[in-house]
């Protein structure tokens, strides 16, 4: 295929605006998939994607389009996620393209991730095609959506915006033609040494690491001796090919193409996303810039339920290869044994990783409460970075603590402003700026990451009746008054339940926590005390009811000596029971998440 006939593009949009449905229509109209193979969200092949109805991993597929001028064009499409937790997936996918379709739901208008993805694309100087989806629905407000797009970018005039229904296929042929006319062809040089960007990867137990590559210069051939420049790893390409949407082997790939290389490398750590692939015989002199590594925002402990640590270790290594924004280091818990302290982009990302561990690797995990990174200055001037609440220093050693603050941009109708600002105030947010975008308002807030890592998104949807949308970006670390809450069950500290909270919130949160634990900690033969401590003082306590009655007050008439004997035996049994460790189910650790 001539390079002038190649188009590499992504579809970017807010969550649920119809990216995957449009991708399905493009594959159908270009006959990439047959009618028999066609089904909804064809590229969303993960179990978690089908369960949640969202795209988690970017997918690439090659299509061949017969244009109106009678010539055939190669369309390399990348379908990207829309959830705020997966911005990193969008950014690395856009690095492999020259343009993108900016998709907007006509019933929702421009939303937070529309704006965030638009900015990512503009930073990479990509050509954008604005497309309005779901115009066939009775609730579509086309004029308002067109006005919002024009406010976002003055180049998005009503004449430039394509109006479609991805579900019915209305207007999609015009999108295919616009891709050919408006998006630029790649500008690589076939005669230069091979230079290719590794923009994604997956692990196959038989073939090893399979790298997704975008060729910048040169040619790539099967069985060629290749080198990863940053990883300094040489290997022979076992096979190369393209996704259509399944893997289709090819004899060669040329500059501008998007495809895959079967590396045969069995160690997932040796192939990193963002690396430059080149030829051993004639290597390129300068590697590509690659990616800024994703910064983990939320941390949680993952421990194997059945003590199968080797299986968990192998699973997290392979997941890290496929999803570099997921990080891990080994840690040990007194209560749960050996596991990993893992970093995530958000709590939804954490949920997806848990489900992928179960679905793809058959590993069930216990998860501790998520937390953010704290920077602690000690009284001796030493700086300590804390990702695990257990490692939070004693209060007598601390001079000050800083935590990450985020810039949260909330896009909403004007009617929701008061309710949203009230919610932000409850979560220690302060208003920075208000701006208008058509008939929408964009509120910029400064808010602690720890306050939006849990239930803020769902509460925002609730108070705005589903109309508000959120995007976040890191601002700075600022000083906060924070304390460590430690939990004892049966007088034994449970380190996995330790968490860090603002001092003013500690009394209420600990009372709620011990009340939740009262119903989730397994009952024993004797009352089990559950208490929460802050700075060495118990500030909340409950007793988990026993399975049996108190022998001394069971309503029967006994002699004094008989009752004394019962009490002595019961007291001895209580002392023995206090030394027993209680096996804790996941519901105990979930008690923190519901605060």
Swiss-Prot record:
Gene3D superfamilies listed in its UniProt record: 3.30.70.240, Elongation factor 4, C-terminal domain, Elongation Factor G (Translational Gtpase), domain 3, P-loop containing nucleotide triphosphate hydrolases, Translation factors
Main subcellular location of this protein, as a coarse class: membrane
Primary role: Required for accurate and efficient protein synthesis under certain stress conditions. May act as a fidelity factor of the translation reaction, by catalyzing a one-codon backward translocation of tRNAs on improperly translocated ribosomes. Back-translocation proceeds from a post-translocation (POST) complex to a pre-translocation (PRE) complex, thus giving elongation factor G a second chance to translocate the tRNAs correctly. Binds to ribosomes in a GTP-dependent manner.
Keyword field: Cell membrane, GTP-binding, Hydrolase, Membrane, Nucleotide-binding, Protein biosynthesis
Topology versus the membrane: Peripheral membrane protein
Recorded superkingdom: Bacteria
Protein name per Swiss-Prot or TrEMBL: Elongation factor 4 2
Domain tr-type G as annotated: residue spans: 4-187
């Amino acid at each position: 295929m001539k390079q002038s006939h190649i188009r590499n593009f992504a579809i970017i949009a807010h969550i649920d605006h119809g990216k995957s449905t449009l991708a399905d229509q493009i594959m159908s109209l270009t006959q990439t998939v047959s009618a028999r193979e066609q089904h909804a969200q064809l590229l969303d092949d993960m179990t978690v994607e089908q369960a949640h109805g969202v795209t988690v991993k970017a997918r690439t597929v090659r299509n061949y389009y017969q244009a109106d001028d009678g010539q055939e064009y190669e369309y390399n499409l990348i379908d990207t996620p829309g959830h705020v937790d997966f911005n990193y997936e969008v950014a690395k996918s856009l690095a492999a393209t020259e343009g993108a379709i900016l998709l907007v739901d006509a019933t929702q208008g421009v939303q937070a991730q529309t704006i965030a993805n638009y900015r990512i694309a503009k930073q990479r100087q990509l050509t954008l095609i604005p497309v309005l989806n779901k115009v066939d629905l009775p609730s579509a407000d086309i004029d308002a959506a067109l006005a919002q797009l024009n406010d976002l970018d003055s180049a998005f005039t009503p004449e430039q915006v394509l109006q479609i229904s991805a579900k019915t296929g209305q207007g999609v042929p015009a999108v295919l033609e616009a891709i050919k006319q408006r998006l630029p062809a790649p500008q690589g040089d076939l005669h230069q040494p091979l230079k290719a960007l590794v923009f994604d990867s997956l692990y196959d137990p038989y073939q090893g690491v399979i790298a997704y590559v975008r060729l910048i210069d040169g040619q790539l051939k099967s069985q060629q001796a290749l080198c990863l420049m940053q990883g300094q790893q040489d290997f022979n390409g076992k096979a190369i090919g393209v996704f259509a949407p399944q893997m289709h082997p090819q004899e060669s790939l040329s500059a501008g193409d998007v495809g895959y290389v079967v590396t045969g490398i069995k160690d997932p750590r040796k192939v990193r996303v963002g690396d430059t692939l080149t030829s051993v015989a004639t290597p390129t002199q300068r590697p590509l810039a690659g990616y800024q590594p994703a910064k983990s925002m939320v941390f949680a402990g993952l421990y194997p339920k059945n003590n199968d640590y080797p299986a968990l270790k192998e699973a997290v290594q392979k997941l890290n290869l496929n999803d570099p924004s997921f990080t891990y280091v080994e840690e040990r818990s007194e209560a749960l044994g050996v596991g990993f302290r893992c970093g995530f982009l958000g709590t939804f990302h954490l949920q997806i990783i848990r489900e992928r561990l179960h679905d793809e690797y058959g590993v069930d995990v216990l998860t501790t409460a998520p937390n953010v990174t704290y920077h602690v200055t000690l009284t001796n001037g030493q700086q300590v970075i804390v990702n695990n609440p257990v490692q939070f220093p004693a209060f007598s050693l601390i001079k000050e603590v800083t935590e990450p603050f985020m810039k949260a941009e909330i896009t909403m109708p004007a009617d929701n402003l008061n309710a949203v600002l009230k919610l932000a105030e409850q979560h220690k947010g302060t208003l920075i700026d208000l701006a208008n975008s058509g008939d929408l308002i964009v509120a910029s807030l400064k808010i602690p990451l720890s306050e939006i890592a849990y239930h803020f998104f769902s509460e925002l949807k609730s108070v705005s009746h589903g109309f508000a949308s959120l995007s976040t970006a890191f601002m700075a670390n600022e000083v906060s008054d924070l304390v460590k809450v430690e939990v004892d069950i049966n007088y034994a500290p449970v380190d996995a339940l330790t968490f860090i909270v603002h001092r003013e919130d500690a009394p209420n949160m600990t009372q709620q926590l011990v009340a939740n634990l009262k119903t989730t900690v397994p009952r024993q033969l004797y009352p089990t005390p559950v208490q929460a401590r802050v700075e060495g003082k118990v500030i909340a306590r409950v007793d988990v009811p026993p399975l049996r009655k108190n022998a001394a007050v069971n309503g029967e008439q006994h002699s004094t000596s008989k009752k004394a004997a019962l009490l002595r035996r019961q007291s001895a049994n209580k002392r023995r029971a206090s030394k027993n460790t209680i096996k804790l189910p996941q519901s105990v650790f979930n008690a923190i998440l519901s605060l």
